[in-house]
Each structure stands twice: as C-alpha cells, then as structure tokens.
C-alpha cells in the first residue's frame, strides 16, 4: 500500500503545475501539493495548496494548516498567524485545531512574545480533550516561554514535569538538553549536588532508559552514601537498572552484596531470587536451586517464595527428580492460590503425572485446573488434556462429550482442531462449515455534523492513499462519540479500508456480528498479493505467512517491539542482515525493514530456513521464530517425546508456547475463511 501511495504521489509530482490552475480538480492539486510538502519542497507546494481553497474542498483545513506551517518556517509570522486564525475560525472541528494553537504559540515565541505564548499554551493544556502528543509539546514550549520570561527555575520545573509525566515522549530528550543548558547558564541556581536532586534525576534517567547516565549518578550516590540504609537504597536501584538493561554480569555482585550485607532487609529475598533467576537462565541449575532454597527457607513470608518454589520444582524436574518436583509444584498450588504462577504449577504437575503414565492422577489434576481456570489461560488446554489423559486410561466413550464440547466452542481455540482429530481417531467426524461469504455492507447511518466532518475527510484522504491521516480522522470520531450500533460498524469498515487492522479488530470485537463476519475483520487478507508472491517464491503456505504476521505485528508495517524487532514479520536487524547476505543482497537499514516488500522478502526466507532446519515441522519452526534456534535445539534434547502436541505443551517458555498455539489457530481460521481448496 505504501508503494501504491508512492506511485500516486509520483504521478502528481510529474504533472505540470499548469494542470492545477484555478478551476482544476482540487483533489489532484492537494495530492500534488502534499507530495511536494512531504518531499521538502514547500515553495512548489504553496501555490497548489492555495488553489484548493477556492470552493468547498473537503480538505481545505489541511491546506490552510500546511500553508501556516510553510509561512512559519519561512519566518513570515504575520502570514502564519493569519492562516491559523482562518483555520480556527472556519474549521473549529478540524483535526488540526490543537496543532494550530501550538503553532500560534510558536509564532509568539519566535517573536519573543513570551507572555502571550505562555497564555496560549496554558489555555491549551487545560483542555479536557487535548491529545497526549500535543500536551507534551505544549508543556515543553511552556517551559521555553518561562525561560524567556526570565524564570529559569520555573522553566526547569516544567521540564521535570514533562519528564515525569512522559518519560518516553519524543520531547523528553529535548527537555534534558534544555535543562543541561539552564544548569550551564545558571550554575548558581542549579548546584545539582543535593542527595535528593541527584536521586530524582537518576530515577528520571532510569525511567527514560538512559542507562549510562543513570548508572553514573547512581554510582556517585552509592559512593557518597552516608549510612547503611542509603547505601542499600542505591545498591537496589543500581542492580535494578542493570537488570532492566539485561546487564546481568554487572547486577550479580550488587545483588550478592545486598543478600550478604543486608540479610534483615526486605531487599534480601529479592536479591537472592534474582541471583537464582540469573543462574537459572544460564542453565546453572544446581547453583540456582541453592538460591531458590535460601529464599524458601530464610524468608518464608516474602513475596518471592511462590516463584522460588516454582523455580525449584522446575529444576527438580530438569534433573529427573519427579517426587521432589511434584511436591514443590503442589506446594505452589496449595499455599499460593492467588499466585501468578499457581496455574502454571498445576499444569506442570499434571504433566508430571501424564509423562509417568499415572493417567488417573493426570486426569484429576487437569480437570481441577480446567475448573479453576475455566475462562483463563489454561481453561481449554486443561480440558483437552483431561480428555487425552482419560482416553489413554481407556475411557474412550466418556471423553467424546468433552472433545465435542471443545470442537464446538468456536474456532478461536487452538484446541478445536485437536479435538476434531481426536473425534476422528475415535470413529466420529464433524463437518466443518463452508467458507463464509459476507452479506453486503449496510449503508451509512445518519450521523451528526461533527461526525460527518471527520468522516468525509477520512474518505477523501483514503482516496489519496493518505491512510495515516485518514485513520487520525477516524480516531477523532472514536474518541469524541463512543460509537455504538451501525456507527460502530461503519467505523470498523473505515478502519479496515485504511489498513488500520488493529483498530478494526478492536471495534469488531465490540460490534454485534456473526462469528464468521467478525473474523473477516479480525483475520484480514492484508498485503495478500505480496504474500502470495513470496509464498510462491519460497514454496510456503500463504496462510501460514498471514497467520504469523497477524501474531507478530497485526499487519502494522511500522511495528517496533521492545526488543527492537521491526516491521511486518518483526525481524531483528542481525537476523535480517544474516538472511540478506544469504540472498546476496545488501543488509537493510532499519528504515528499509519497515518496507513491506523488504520485510517479507527476508522474513519469509527466514521462516523457510527454519522449516528446512526442523524437517518442515511447523510447531518447532514457529517456536524457533519466537524464541530462537538455540532454545528449540535445547528443547529437542530435553523434551523426549514423538508426540508433537505434547512437545508444544512442554515448551518451557510460556510466551513461546502460547505463540505457537496462536499462530496455528490463526492459520486454521485463515484456511476456513478464505481457502477454496479445503
């Protein structure tokens, strides 16, 4: 779709500007103007934007705003003010209204009219419907105005407020730089030497993920700590900083010092547990077990006992000590009914019985978990394995109703397909429904003037393939009206039309639709032509690619994970570079990985490589896509079973186990919805 937009803009850029004289199509003029504007050619854009202001062009407020920005950037502040006043008077409902207010303040700041700028920004910030990005920039500009008014302390405090409220805002880095300039300019006002001021700044830097700068301050605070309590405080903060940055080698000695020197503190059990976790992740299981036992024995009332019991059980299981593992898992289940690891412990306990061939105990434990977690993570999973355990015990007739219950529970469950296979194995079969054919969409409902204002603009922008702007208009409708009924269905379709699949999915979940019709919005054929092309090149199932992308990025080309995975198939740059070299092409930049063609080329090749590595075993290939080949290679050694269903259930990483199931579920639904050959 980005390619289509680029073609459209290239087409309009190629036309002679005489084609957009007065009386010409304002839509074409706007498209060409926008192409110039976003390509850094404001002079060429100006006249074209002006030509769209004659008549009732639906995007006139956009043209007025862009003209105001161009005038501001040219230093023509009076003309910029005129355009902004025009926008706010003619289009009070415009998406650009708050941005226009910001630009008004910038005009005043540019002319050093700090009092006027401050008043504009103060009024903007008290608006109830102010957008988060606008609020952050307004606070930053208000701090600048205070500085200009000769109030550096107040400016500094406003920068602190911005950093405290929005540590991940794009304005936060600017605020840090501005504060550094203020400290340099006014050293007498900002000595920056008190314990409290240094600690607050270190905490802010840590929240902003400025690990290196935070480390320097925490070390300074630690070295200058006047008493044991203060020293413990900063040992804890510094160790937490290292752990959040995955710098475990630096964290270890600090955690050991906390556990050794402050055994009576509340931080001691945390330190012991985290040391155990580090060792556990390094597969130094014997030493890790000692630390978990220390938590259990020395700090039985701490908040880390349940997790330490669970970790100890896992290690006992790794060493083949079934009885010790079962006892530890059972302790978690009985002693910590509200623990986050309680259900996982009962799941692992049931599997201990299953693997040992103790089917009555396995059946009872799975059954108890199914009842306990009826609507939770393990509900259907435990119910299915309750039936499998009973079937292995010879109860073939009593399990059929359970399999039927699972198979009729809707395609949202990974276990529906497993239950259908089980019924076929037991001599029964259930016909799957034919592919769904949607009914014609209803016409638009009657809408208010405010909704119509944004809806007409969204549709105009969609025609020009300016989908992010169209989605922003639809977001205004969603935020201002809390739509219901037919309006919600309309919004769902418009989001879908503009490739905002996450938003259309969210609205579809709240819209009264049949399951099959809802699934069309929840499981879109996004990027279908490109995916079909890549699937043919790699000999891959196109529905598997769709299923994986839906789980990885929900078809958001600009998706970026906390682990720096990028684009549709969430590739990390080292993997992308490795696959690119394999294909004989240049390693892509991060920006290139946001392009659908590049991302799909590399991502589908990586998926193909994994399938080849694991003998076309989808479950293992998907597990490796999520957790890495090294992890799956280790699990192949540790999980001794030929039953692939069992292999999936015994994947130690909860996230990876769920990921494999969800991708396979997605694939099944895609096949049901769209595959004419099934």
Model-predicted regions and their roles:
Residues 656:
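Short, flexible loop segments at boundaries between secondary-structure elements
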Residues 1-2, 12, 19-569, 573, ...:
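Acidic, polar-rich low-complexity tracts and alpha-helical solenoid repeat scaffolds
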